[in-house]
């Protein structure tokens, strides 16, 4: 359930950024032309824009390569937030797996009873169970996502509002014009990312997902990439390039985190058995 809320929050942020971005693009029909005032512009967009120009300058004006490298740099900077959240999720899941029979029993009783007093008593029993096992569902939260979102949004708008990008090309496409192949590449990459994330989660999760949650996860695997492709077709190709790079990084990141955690658990179990 918590992961579902986090995915919905991420999708909500993504929609807000893209909708506002599409409005700006409709007004300018090019990269650039966004407002040059405000705290967000001065402390996030402008520094990222300067970084994009600086990196491009190191590679003879290759803004496509600059977008790729800056995206990777930013993803590495926010990586500790992901790692911290990932570890908390795994610890939470492992603790929940231990108390799952008791939790299921309480939830069954909650569904059956209509008495408010009995419901309150069962809820208190659930809270006591959490406290006994040092479980705090609220401690997971979405804070890491909320912290990194302004950073990633800042980079998004920096790519949009850096006019030099529009006049350059990368590989086969112009960065300032929409490109069907690049749009499809971004959509496919996010499908691959979501698909792998779902498979790894199902494989390594300590708590089996209920059928409803599994169905919801499968639906999101298809919805998000379709949305990504549609939006990508209506923006300059510089943005799908950014999304493709970000999606590829997240895919590799997820694989490494999941496999590293699984390997460390196996090592710990073997060490414990030797003792």
UniProtKB/Swiss-Prot annotation:
It is a multi-pass membrane protein. It is found in: Cell membrane. Disruption phenotype: Disruption decreases genetic competence by about 50%, significant loss of expression of ComGC, no effect on sporulation. A double spoIIIJ-yqjG deletion is lethal. Coiled coil: none annotated. Keywords: Cell membrane, Chaperone, Lipoprotein, Membrane, Palmitate, Protein transport, Signal, Transmembrane, Transmembrane helix, Transport. One of its GO terms (biological process) is protein insertion into membrane. GO terms for molecular function: membrane insertase activity. The keyword Chaperone applies. A lipid is attached at residue 19 (S-diacylglycerol cysteine). A lipid is attached at residue 19 (N-palmitoyl cysteine). The chain crosses the membrane at residues 63-83, 139-159, 172-192, 219-239, 240-260. One of its GO terms (cellular component) is plasma membrane. It holds the Pfam family 60KD_IMP. Residues 1-18 form the signal peptide. Belongs to the OXA1/ALB3/YidC family. Type 2 subfamily. Required for the insertion and/or proper folding and/or complex formation of integral membrane proteins into the membrane. Involved in integration of membrane proteins that insert both dependently and independently of the Sec translocase complex, as well as at least some lipoproteins. Also involved in protein secretion processes. It has an overlapping, although partly distinct, function compared to SpoIIIJ(MisCB). Mostly monomeric, it may also form dimers. Interacts with SpoIIIAE. Forms a complex with the F(1)F(0) ATP synthase in which can be found the alpha, beta, gamma, delta and epsilon subunits of F(1) and a, b and subunits of F(0). YqgA is found in the same complex. This is Membrane protein insertase MisCB. It comes from Bacillus subtilis (strain 168). The gene is misCB.
């Amino acid at each position: 359930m918590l992961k579902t809320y986090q995915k919905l929050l991420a999708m909500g942020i993504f929609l807000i950024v893209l909708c506002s971005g599409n409005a700006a693009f409709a007004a300018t029909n090019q990269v650039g032309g966004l407002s040059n005032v405000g705290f967000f512009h001065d402390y996030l967009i402008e520094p990222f824009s300067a970084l994009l120009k600086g990196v491009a300058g190191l590679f003879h004006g290759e803004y496509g390569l600059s977008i790729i490298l800056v995206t990777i740099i930013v993803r590495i900077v926010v990586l500790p937030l992901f790692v911290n959240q990932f570890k908390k999720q795994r610890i939470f899941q492992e603790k929940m797996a231990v108390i799952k029979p008791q939790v299921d029993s309480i939830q069954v009783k909650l569904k059956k009873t209509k008495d408010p007093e009995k419901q309150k008593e069962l809820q208190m029993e659930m809270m006591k169970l959490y406290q006994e096992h040092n479980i705090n569902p609220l401690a997971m939260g979405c804070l890491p996502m909320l912290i990194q979102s302004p950073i990633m949004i800042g980079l998004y708008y920096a790519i949009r509002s850096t006019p030099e990008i529009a006049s350059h090309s990368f590989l086969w496409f112009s960065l300032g014009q929409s490109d069907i192949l690049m749009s499809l590449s971004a959509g496919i990459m996010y499908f691959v990312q979501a698909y792998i994330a779902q498979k790894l989660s199902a494989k390594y999760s300590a708590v089996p997902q209920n059928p409803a949650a599994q169905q919801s996860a499968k639906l999101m695997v298809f919805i998000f990439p379709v949305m990504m492709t549609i939006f990508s077709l209506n923006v300059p190709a510089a943005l799908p390039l950014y999304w493709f790079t970000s999606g590829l990084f997240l895919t590799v990141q997820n694989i490494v985190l999941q496999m590293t955690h699984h390997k460390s658990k196996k090592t710990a179990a073997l060490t414990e058995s030797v003792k």
